[in-house]
């Protein structure tokens, strides 16, 4: 084991000598208190270490001890419902062990409890041939998730021993006879966070991730296994949007990373999620959630670790054939941590002081998203979908973190402070946002809703763009100077904005909107548009069209349950629309 000595300390960056024999990204214990750090640079016998804990009080001359292993996470039953810090230390366990609401420096608590016994049910039998990724048994970890125990990387052969029963994560549940001899398999495995977990190959992203948010699903959909960015200035609703995604997304597991954001926002997640029901299983949302809390007052170096810890945990659940959503709030804080450490290392700064390797670091993270065919002899498919919030100072989307993120992700949900000030939520600007997955996922929508979904969606987008062009004229001469047809376009665009795009995150029905309800709502508004244009062409007054009472029914449809709306209200609204608009024709 390499033992060196501290010669320089600069904030979270420590320089140690006598480190010959160390490896890049090796975890080391720094100082007399044994603070956790990671080697990020090696020169001759000197190592530069980023320390994941507060360095106040340590001094030159104290020891640095290598562990011989890279920064790794423990993967196994017990991760769901847990809350970790950036280097996978369980916060609840630390509080119980130290009787303190603060994390003491140098504290070491196992990431996964070694005392809890899990009921392991073997699905493989003695004599079965197994390879890496094969499922040999299951554990009912929470009411929502059955945790699959897999053969770790590098083991393949014939099962010599396996039995069902209650085991801790360190006890042997199976013995595999391999070419190199007998290998024991436990329920827990370790994986280095910077190394992507392997798969057989990536699959095309053709299935949409249903989030229940109309503007995201219908207009700017993200595919399962895709990557999306939510940039927006302060107060535009990034965190509420992330919370909505974590609550309602059509996934099996959610990994929520609070990376350098306010502690109150993590508190909100912890307080809310245990009381909310998962629409897929009917169980509590917390049963399928892993929280990684790395708030703004925690050491900056741990922000990078929290992002890699989160994506590695997400890939592990993906390898079980599950769908995982990873939300990172916010990647800008991670980039700021990189900038701070780069400054301490006296590296050549890039644009706005960020390091020159900013774009490659972001790409390494987002490229770990994807829908894959999992390792193993059975046909398993899983996906990781990444949604990263970006907090550009002053809402400037041309700044380096936002512009580099846009080069990597295929979905851009641009939050607009002006919409937020007008109380339009989600404040996603339909003119600047985009999705490059629409062509890929249109087939699923047409199969699961109706064949005209794509044409309705494109026509609605065209109307919203046309409204933006007409607004300039309206501000100069007023709406009454416009031709009748264009006055109808303005009215329909207003209905699209207020009755379709706006959504109440705190309303028990409107908080989540199913794909079929989304389609029917859009169909009604676009049917109204077609019939209103027809009525105007036959001599109806646009003022009369704007005054029909069916518009009140259209405005209220978002608050109706799926059953009531689709089975009862849709035909009623269309019949009422036809009779009221028909009565206006002279």
From Swiss-Prot:
Cited PROSITE patterns: ATPASE_ALPHA_BETA (PS00152)
The organism's place on the tree of life at top rank: Archaea
Location within or outside the cell: Cell membrane
MF terms in GO: ATP binding; proton-transporting ATP synthase activity, rotational mechanism; proton-transporting ATPase activity, rotational mechanism
Membrane topology value: Peripheral membrane protein
Enzyme class of the recorded protein, top EC level: translocase
Binding-site residues for ATP, renumbered to this chain: 232-239
Keywords: ATP synthesis, ATP-binding, Cell membrane, Hydrogen ion transport, Ion transport, Membrane, Nucleotide-binding, Translocase, Transport
UniProt catalytic activity: ATP + H2O + 4 H(+)(in) = ADP + phosphate + 5 H(+)(out)
Cystine pairs: none
Record-level GO BP terms: proton motive force-driven plasma membrane ATP synthesis
Annotated EC: 7.1.2.2
Record GO cellular component, one term: proton-transporting two-sector ATPase complex, catalytic domain
Short name of any one Pfam family annotated for the protein: ATP-synt_ab
Role, per record: Component of the A-type ATP synthase that produces ATP from ADP in the presence of a proton gradient across the membrane. The A chain is the catalytic subunit.
Family: Belongs to the ATPase alpha/beta chains family.
Complexes and interactors: Has multiple subunits with at least A(3), B(3), C, D, E, F, H, I and proteolipid K(x).
Protein name: A-type ATP synthase subunit A
Species: Methanococcus maripaludis (strain C5 / ATCC BAA-1333)
Gene: atpA
């Amino acid at each position: 084991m390499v033992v060196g000595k501290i010669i320089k300390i600069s904030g979270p960056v420590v320089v140690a000598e006598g480190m010959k024999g160390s490896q890049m990204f090796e975890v080391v214990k720094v100082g007399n208190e044994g603070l956790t750090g990671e080697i990020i640079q090696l020169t001759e016998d000197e190592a530069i270490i980023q320390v994941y804990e507060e360095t106040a009080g340590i001094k030159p001359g104290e020891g640095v001890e290598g562990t011989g292993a890279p920064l790794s996470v423990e993967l196994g039953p017990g991760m769901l419902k847990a809350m970790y810090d950036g280097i996978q230390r369980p916060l609840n366990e630390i509080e119980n062990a130290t009787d303190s609401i603060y994390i003491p420096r140098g504290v070491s608590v196992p990431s996964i409890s070694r005392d809890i016994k899990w009921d392991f049910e073997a699905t493989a039998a003695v004599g079965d041939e197994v390879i890496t990724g094969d499922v040999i048994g299951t554990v009912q970890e929470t009411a929502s998730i059955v945790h699959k125990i897999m053969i770790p990387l590098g083991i393949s052969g014939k099962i010599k021993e396996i039995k069902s029963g209650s085991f801790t994560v360190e006890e042997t549940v199976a013995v595999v006879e391999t070419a190199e001899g007998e290998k024991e398999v436990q329920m827990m495995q370790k994986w280095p966070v910077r190394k992507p977990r392997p798969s057989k190959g990536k699959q095309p992203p053709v299935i949409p991730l249903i989030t229940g948010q109309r503007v995201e699903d219908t207009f700017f959909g993200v595919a399962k296994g895709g990557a999306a960015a939510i940039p927006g200035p302060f107060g535009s609703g990034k965190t509420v949007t992330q919370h909505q995604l974590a609550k309602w997304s059509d996934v099996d597991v959610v990994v929520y990373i609070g990376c350098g954001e306010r502690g109150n926002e993590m508190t909100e997640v912890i307080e809310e999620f245990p009381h909310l029901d998962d629409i897929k299983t009917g169980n509590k949302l917390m049963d399928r959630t892993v929280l990684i809390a790395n708030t703004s007052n925690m050491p900056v170096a741990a922000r990078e670790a929290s992002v890699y810890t989160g994506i590695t945990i997400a890939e592990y659940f993906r390898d079980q054939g599950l769908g995982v959503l990873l939300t990172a709030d916010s990647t800008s804080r991670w980039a700021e941590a990189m900038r701070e450490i780069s400054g301490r290392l006296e590296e050549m700064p890039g644009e706005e002081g960020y390091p020159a390797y900013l774009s490659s670091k972001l790409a390494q993270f987002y490229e770990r998203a994807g829908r894959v065919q999992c390792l193993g002899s059975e046909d398993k498919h899983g996906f990781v979908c990444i949604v990263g919030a970006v907090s550009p100072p002053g809402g400037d989307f041309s700044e380096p973190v936002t512009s580099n993120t846009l080069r990597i992700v295929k979905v851009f949900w641009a939050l607009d402070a002006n919409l937020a000030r007008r109380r339009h939520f989600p404040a996603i600007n339909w003119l600047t946002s985009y999705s490059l997955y629409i062509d890929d996922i249109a087939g699923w929508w047409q199969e699961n809703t109706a064949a005209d979904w794509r044409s309705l969606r494109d026509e609605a987008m065209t109307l919203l763009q046309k409204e933006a062009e007409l607004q300039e004229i309206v501000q100069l001469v007023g709406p009454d100077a416009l031709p009748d047809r264009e006055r109808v376009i303005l009215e329909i665009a207003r209905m699209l904005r207020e009755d379709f795009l706006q959504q109440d995150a705190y309303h028990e029905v409107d908080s989540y909107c199913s794909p079929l309800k989304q389609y029917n709502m859009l169909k009604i508004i676009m049917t109204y548009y077609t019939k209103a244009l027809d009525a105007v062409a036959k001599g109806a007054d646009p003022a009369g069209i704007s005054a029909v009472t069916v518009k009140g029914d259209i405005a209220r449809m978002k608050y109706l349950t799926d059953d009531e709306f689709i089975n009862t209200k849709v035909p009623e609204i269309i019949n009422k629309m036809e009779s009221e608009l028909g009565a206006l024709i002279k």
